[in-house]
Design a protein with these regions (language model features):
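Cytochrome P450
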Residues: 1-414
Length: 414
């Protein structure tokens, strides 16, 4: 491979390993690499061995760029949005002839991001979410009870259903509305015309408008946001911005990431009967186990950034306006290792990770994700204590349009 543009990039060794085809070729992006699909731990381990910066110039042009693989470099980039900017993201929906921006993901300045954060962070705080913990557990228990007598299931379907129902419930909408769940799923998959997203927006607008006029509406974290938008002429967010935030929550950020984490947690537990028993006997360890799943199997293994100026990392020059991939999973595995971490007495111990990002773009829904994971895993283990992979079944990953890495299927039996 010719490295004349950046001559000090490391050689790609072992030859062809990261590509997975045995060829003497540069590595592919993790979304395209069969090596990642076969063994993601080995993929990131070998990527780190190539150096702190690894150039990807094969495969899909939209996925090419530079991987940052070291923990400290990833963390520094997350905390420096002026140099490593979040690329603009839009929905397929057109507004006044232009695509609707995905805010606050696409906001590039701290002051603008703070305008959103001041309104949104209190809605998704542990204190605001705490009243929903019991209902989230009840919802998980109901789903587990429904399938327990079947002696088998595709856990991906169960996790997707739970994540969807949980989000609708926490937001004050009917959790059992199958049509709403289908619309949310269609919006996640998306289409070039934006029709699926538009139908979801219309349904959300109708549902929230009806709720605002209903004094007996169920509780939900979005009601204060919508009430202030309607009644406060000095409210810091516009109606379009609030609509974009809500669409982002229901079509991109709020369902698939949690569903992915749940399925990978169940995959680990299906392979480890001792760990299942340990968590069942001591549920207080479940939050630490969930954090380890976020560290080892983050729904977004790497996130994109664009350099606003030339930078040098690990002796490698990265030009301005280059695509850079912050390898969150590689960063989390750097010091924590590739296995669930144990303490001196065998207890599950959480290690630091960056699955939720960092800095001003840190995931708004991280506390909700943790609450849902704890509720689901607790109730699942209470009702389905012993389970395993269905004989002959091999799990495979799939990369969703939202950039979430999910399992295609997870066939369990008990």
């Amino acid at each position: 491979m010719n490295h004349t543009d950046v001559p000090d990039l490391p050689d790609y060794a072992p030859r062809g390993a990261l590509r997975g085809d045995g060829a003497s070729s540069p590595p592919l992006h993790h979304k395209e690499s069969p090596f990642f699909a076969a063994d993601r731990a080995a993929f990131w381990r070998q990527l780190r061995e190539l150096g702190p910066v690894v150039k990807i110039d094969a495969g899909d042009p939209l996925l090419r760029g530079y991987y940052l693989t070291r923990r400290d470099d990833v963390r520094a980039a997350l905390l420096d949005p002026h140099t490593f900017a979040s690329p603009p993201k839009t929905f397929a929906i057109q507004l006044f002839g232009a695509p609707l921006p995905q805010v606050p993901l696409s906001i590039g300045t701290r002051s603008e991001h703070a305008r959103f954060g001041k309104v949104l962070h209190p809605l998704f705080s542990p204190r605001a979410l705490a009243p929903f913990a019991g209902d989230l557990r009840a919802r998980a228990a109901k789903l587990a009870d429904k399938i327990s007598d079947r002696r088998q299931c595709d856990a991906v379907d169960v996790a997707d259903t739970y994540a969807s129902q949980a989000l609708f419930m926490v937001c004050g909408l009917p959790p059992d509305d199958a049509r709403a769940a289908q619309m949310a799923s269609a919006a996640v998959i998306g289409d070039t015309t934006g029709q699926a997203q538009l139908e979801l927006v219309k349904w959300l607008n109708t549902s929230f408008d009806a709720g605002l006029s209903d004094p007996e509406r169920p509780p939900g974290i979005l009601w204060p946001l919508l009430e202030q938008l309607a009644g406060d002429k000095d409210f810091p967010l516009t109606q379009v911005e609030v609509a974009s935030v809500i669409l982002l929550l229901f079509s991109v950020a709020g369902i698939e990431m949690v569903a992915s984490a749940i399925t990978f947690a169940l995959l680990h537990l299906a392979r480890d009967p001792q760990l299942r028993a340990q968590l069942r006997e001591d549920p207080a360890q479940i939050p630490a186990f969930a954090e380890e799943i976020f560290r080892l199997e983050p729904p977004g293994p790497a996130i994109p950034r664009v350099t606003t100026r030339k930078v040098e990392i690990g002796g490698v020059a990265i030009p301005a306006f280059s695509s850079v991939w912050l390898a969150l999973e590689a960063a989390g595995r750097t010091n924590g290792g590739d296995e669930i971490t144990r303490g001196s007495h065998g207890e599950v111990r959480r290690q630091r990770h960056w699955a939720f990002g960092g800095g001003m773009h840190r995931c708004l829904g991280m506390h909700l994700a943790r609450l849902e994971m704890d509720a689901f895993l607790t109730e699942w283990l209470n009702r389905i204590p012993n389970f395993e992979l269905k004989p002959g079944f091999t799990p495979t990953v799939v990369h969703k349009p939202t950039s979430v890495t999910h399992l295609r299927r997870l066939k369990l039996r008990w």
